[in-house]
Amino acid sequence: MAEGVNRNLTRRGVLTSAAATGVGTMAAISGAATIAHAADQKTFVLVHGASAGGWCYRQAADLLEKRGHKVFTPTLTGLGERSHLMSGSINLDTHIADVVNVIKWEGLENIVLVGHSYGGWVISGVAEQTLPAISSIVYLDAFMPEDGQKGLDMNSERSRAEIGEALKRGEVSRPAPPPTVWNVAEKNHAWWNAKATAQPIGVALQPIKLTGARERVAKKTYIRATGYENPNFEAAYQKRKADSSWRTYTVLCGHEVMMDMPERLVEILQEVA
């Protein structure tokens, strides 16, 4: 009897040990998967362009969040839901500070910083102040200013004249253009018309101060929307295409890529993150 009892106890112990080992193995696998998933998670800061707001990234942000990423879509002072703050004191530094402060107060690190159109001015300035926090920088059909340039320098002669007249009248902003100016897809015209707001003039009057921080970001990308003609964006794209330290993409789309092709934009952003 004693031998039989011992044999049963031994068998039970083996089974218990095996079960425990199995649970441990599953836990280890689960833990490894969690770590791997966490490693794949990125933090995106998406900066909009002229007359827009964080709202324009809604579709892209939703897609990124569903894939486990953290997303911030700050709206710049005087635009979108912050249009009530429009004033003549808003300049480029104001908008740079808007984004810098999100990064600072949220304690963000290893971020993918994206700037669309006018947002290229903003992220260029942001990189100067938060370079250690940026792991990837993306210019989405965006301006790429050089040190000392101001927005007015890159405007057309007609646009410069219109801004000059607006300043003489004491105006502090310029109305949002119709969606056809940006070649926005017709299905999104109503969305643009409902949300777009005036752009503060002061942001185009202040020269930017750069030391080349954006070039020191580890991963650099330029995305060109070929469905929108703009010599500034085309020149920026061609210059980066010839530079092996940059990745470049083209999308057959109007200027507002995040509105018209959010799925493709998200694919690219995940590739370059």
Task: Locate predicted features.
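Flexible "cap/lid" loop of the alpha/beta hydrolase fold
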Residues: 139-171, 232
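Conserved loop-alpha-helix segment in the C-terminal half of the alpha/beta-hydrolase fold
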Residues: 227-252, 259
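Conserved hydrolase catalytic core segment
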Residues: 114-146
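Active-site loop/oxyanion-hole signature of alpha/beta-hydrolase fold enzymes
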Residues: 78-111, 128-129, 155-156
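Active-site glycine-rich loops that stabilize anionic/oxyanionic intermediates
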Residues: 49-52, 117
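Conserved alpha/beta-hydrolase
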Residues: 65-83
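C-terminal segment of N-terminal export signals and the immediately downstream linker at the start
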Residues: 29-47, 54, 62, 66
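N-terminal secretory signal peptides
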Residues: 1-9, 20-23, 27
